Swiss-Prot record:
EC number of this enzyme: 2.7.7.101
Subunit structure: Monomer. Interacts with DnaB.
Domain of life: Bacteria
Annotated function: RNA polymerase that catalyzes the synthesis of short RNA molecules used as primers for DNA polymerase during DNA replication.
Protein name: DNA primase
Native organism: Mycoplasmopsis pulmonis (strain UAB CTIP) (Mycoplasma pulmonis)
Gene that encodes the chain: dnaG
Amino acid sequence: MNNLWEIEKKILEKTTLSNLIGKLISIKPKGKSFWALCPFHDDKNASLSISDQKAMFSCFSCNVRGGLFVFYSKFLNKSYVEVANMLAKEFDLDFHFDQQEKEKYNENEQLFIDVTSIANHYFKVSLKSQVHSNSKLVDFLKSRGISRETASEFEIGYDDGNFWKIPNKEKKNFSFFLSNNLIVKKETNQYYDFFYKRVVFPIHNSFGDVVGFSGRALDENNIKYLNSPESLVFKKHKILYNWAKAKEKAIQEKKLYITEGFMDTIALYKIGIKNAIAIMGTNLSNEQLELIPKDIELIFFLDGDQAGKNAVYNILKKIIKMRSKISVIENDSKQDPDELLKQKGANFLKELIEKNKKPAIDYLYEFLLTSKYNINNSEHLISFVNDFAPLLSSQNNIVIDKYENLLMKHSINIRKFLTYQNQKYDRINQYNSLQQRFYEEPKQKKKANSREEILKKQYQNLYVKLLLSLLNSNALLEYFLRHNIEERIIFEQTNNGQESKLKDILRKIIKIQKEKKSETTIEDLPLEDQEILRWYLQKDSWFKSDYAKEGDLDLLANQISESYLEYEKSQKISKTLEMPSLDEEKQKILKRVILQRRSKND
């Protein structure tokens, strides 16, 4: 049997979709369906529905839906073929899809995989043979606690300097050994090993194939680590060290320990923690994060020095709104996990992990107060709240209440920075900050829908229509410049609030057009200006219509001026807004033009 959908059907004849999904997440029956918290987004309301009758699942919040293989593939980060093989084995079904499985790589990628596989085998054999005669290597392995078992488990090898002799230089794929930096060509046309006299750690991708290496120098006087360059198959920001081996255990325990380096991950393995990976640095990329199922708790255990603490802070700040289960092992020792194991022993390391684990939000709070801000300083206090409030907004009400009470001691009302009834701070704040760019807050209270406000928004809308029209038609923009229409718009003279921002956008459009001398689009503007215009586009579908005639542009300019004059009249009773500083003579001329236009229309 080699048909994916046929094997899925056979599996569901032996069990139900809810039974299989229930092995991965907690589900509850309700009516004819089962319901669960959706693992594919930060779900709080059990939005995932599972129907055995239809053999389908569906989330009503994030709209992900599909059958058995879709769920398992997304949840386990496996291909359909991998899922089919796994479940077929579990239900004792005959399934062979080897040819399709090989198609995960194209021809060139497969050559890279083959080359790194050859190198990996050579390095492993070399290590085994060298430990009997190479005292420097033996001393290094002992000092790092790398036993025969550890070397075998993590496929650690050694480059004795003779690997360059293995590939046949006449063969076609020899160039792949060079491009992989396994072999380097000297100016004298001689070859040598890139990882010469180094202990080599293979780096596997999610499929378990070796895609690159990191070589550790035995001599401390040399560069400590040399890494494979990025290639067709090796992209460092898309790979987690040891993920291929750790993911099954991580999925079972719903936990994943995240370290900086190879030896830290190996140290945790030695004390029985097999669900650990290394990010190979101090940054966790979005691509790396996407490899890990969302229901798995991320437990960060980075180096204890200030650089390590800064790294944890930066990572948490980035991902705290993406994941609901994040913890940190607080490490105050200024050492990494590997050093702690060597110097303090396994029991100390286990106890540290057990006792010093804390929620990410607690770590962030303490980090801000100990490493960045002095809460007793008023300026620091404002900066602290601005930094901490968005992080706290992703938490539930219990956590928010805890910090509300804690910060009240410092006269900080954190609720003022969060949304009502536990809505997400970032969403409402993004909306409010955008609103503030458009409309200046009045200096005194006004009725919500006062005539003044209505007129103000009306001429702003007209002005935005002008800007979008100029962006939508290069011919109109040229007409606008040629006939000096800008000079006829009263609204352009003001310097208040959003009017000033829109005026600046118009000037940028004109400047871009003169410099570019080609079609000007909204994408040519700075991001902030694009955001303002797109906000209006979302508000009113009328903006999406282009002006087709030049006469419309003249009419629009007059409409803007008329609208502004109407608004100007409504302002006279208010002391909060100032009259625009217009030359008296110019005002008379402009008003005369408008009156003439009105009489023609009548």
